[in-house]
UniProtKB/Swiss-Prot annotation:
The gene is CYP110. Keywords: Glycoprotein, Heme, Iron, Membrane, Metal-binding, Monooxygenase, Oxidoreductase, Transmembrane, Transmembrane helix. It comes from Postia placenta (strain ATCC 44394 / Madison 698-R). Heme binds at residue 440. This is Cytochrome P450 monooxygenase 110. Its cofactor is heme. It is found in: Membrane.
Length: 498
């Protein structure tokens, strides 16, 4: 019995020694940590970060130029301030990788699908033909918005009654309709079973990510294997999308060299990208799903934040409505018209400044050892990010940074400098979409879609919060930010511009 006890104590001693050696030789140990950093107790820091990421990121930002926060299985290095954001943006792709950082933080190979994670065919399509053809595609987006709102809003709102609406759920369904009008077209973009599949998938990614990130790295392949949502979505979406793919490919083959009548839309661009990279066409289904995740999850959150602000600050509705009415009367429902809505653009950018989708941005994984300008050494394998929310609430860059000022960016714009402060643009002080060449490529499509939806709402509905309810606080889980589930009251207006 004594021998067994001695073996146990010896084993514990060896483990403790290994932990101490690992901790004392950790190449990130020289970087200040927010919370306990010693072995074992660092898990307490990870728990605190899960529950209180906002305050932890703010604390680190105001204390240090570079600091680190704890996840379950690793440290994440965070840089503070606009200058460091810019420095991180400029590190060459030979030394850091955005894609590998996204893989680690979002666990794409488990939460999305392994094929499209390895061969992201959607990225060049979004960055290239989708963005170039937004003007031509925009009428379809507007048409779907005009059809979807009357169908999906509660009937009582049409009778002029105030009705409570679950904004995030309803906006998610409308975003999915408008986005899939571009992704897969009519009539599939209105198919209830298909839409249920893509919407559930879009919101399952966050759930899967939370589960995976809570598991130690060694167990993640096992946990990931049993996560059902991505596999189910690929299977169910394939039932609807694969016949379209086969039809397109068949027509291309029948046409031979004469491709003058070839479809010019998102689905065809994905097919062409898959063929160009010699991928099985099943990857196109995954590309459609990833596109839906990016469109539905982020856009439904963004427009929900904007609507909560619109309902909480009703004094700003009239100037927005007057701007939208005047521009629509002159230019119609066109992409050009949306671009001229400077006040609406400012309102939504300000909403995004205070209520982005994440408290961090400009994520990178170090591929080769680098040293930052302040002397901080980052070894290969380090995850490094910028503190987005803390930057956006820094009084060095924004006057009264904690206050929602809807026309803050409108007041900064002039005819000669109209573009720099528009919603879609990034800067070292505004990193909601990332910054630099790895900034979100879909932001041009998303911003135009969201502004069209907001313009439609402002012209067709009055909105307000329930009596005695103020703008609810956002919900933080880890560094991920979501709008609260508070309902917003809607009432259809009798006088509106068509």
């Amino acid at each position: 019995m004594e021998d067994k006890a001695q073996y146990v104590f010896a084993l514990l001693g060896i483990l403790a020694t290994l932990y101490f050696v690992r901790w004392s030789t950790d190449p990130l140990r020289h970087i200040p940590a927010i919370g306990p950093s010693a072995p074992i107790v660092s898990y307490l820091s990870a728990y605190r970060y899960c529950r209180n990421a906002q305050s932890i990121l703010q604390e680190g930002y105001h204390k240090y130029k570079v600091f680190r926060v704890s996840l379950v299985d690793r440290w994440v290095v965070v840089v503070s301030g606009a200058d460091m954001n810019e420095e991180l943006r400029k590190v060459p792709d030979t030394h850091v990788s955005f894609q590998e950082a996204a893989d680690d933080l979002i666990q794409l190979k488990y939460t999305i699908a392994p094929d499209v994670n390895e061969h992201p065919i959607h990225t060049p399509v979004i960055r290239g033909p989708l963005t170039r053809n937004l003007g031509a595609l925009f009428p379809d987006v507007v048409d779907e918005i005009n059809v979807a709102f009357p169908e999906l809003m509660p009937p009582a709102a049409k009778r002029g009654d105030w009705v409570a609406v679950s904004v995030r759920d309803t906006m998610g369904r409308i975003v999915s309709r408008a986005s899939n009008r571009i992704f897969v077209g009519l009539p599939l973009c209105r198919n209830p079973d298909y839409l249920k599949t893509v919407v559930e998938f879009a919101f399952s990614v966050a759930k899967s990510r939370t589960i995976i990130n809570a598991a130690p790295a060694v167990f993640r392949p096992i946990v990931g294997h049993f996560l059902p949502w991505a596999k189910r979505a690929v299977r169910n979406a394939g039932v609807h999308v694969k016949p379209l793919i086969r039809l397109r490919v068949s027509k291309m083959q029948d046409a031979g060299d004469d491709q003058t009548d070839k479809s010019c839309d998102y689905l065809m661009w994905l097919i062409e990208e898959a063929q160009k990279t010699k991928q099985n066409l099943d990857i196109v289904v995954q590309g459609i799903l990833v596109s839906n995740f990016a469109a539905i999850h982020t856009s439904s959150n963004s427009i929900t934040h904007s609507l909560l602000n619109l309902a909480a600050y009703p004094q700003h509705v009239q100037p927005l409505r007057e701007e939208i009415e005047g521009i629509i009367k002159e230019y119609g429902w066109t992409k050009e018209a949306i671009g001229k809505m400077w006040k609406l653009d400012s309102f939504m950018r300000e909403s995004q400044r205070l209520s982005g989708i994440s408290g961090i941005s400009v994520m990178r994984k170090v591929l080769q050892d680098i040293t930052l300008s302040d002397g901080t050494y980052l070894p290969k394998g380090t995850l490094v990010v910028a503190a987005a929310f803390a930057t956006h609430t820094d009084e060095r860059y924004y006057e009264n940074p904690e206050v929602f000022e809807p026309f803050r960016f409108y007041d900064m714009r002039t005819e000669n400098d109209a573009l720099r402060k528009q919603y879609v643009n990034t800067s070292r002080e505004f990193i909601t979409f990332g910054h630099g060449k790895h900034a979100c490529p879909g932001r041009f499509f998303a911003v135009n879609e969201l502004k069209a939806m907001m313009a439609y709402i402002i012209l067709h509905y009055d909105v307000k919060l329930e009596e005695g309810v103020s703008r609810p606080e956002n919900v933080w889980i880890w560094h991920n930010i979501s709008p609260a589930s508070t309902k917003v009251l809607f009432r259809e207006r009798q006088s509106k511009v068509q």
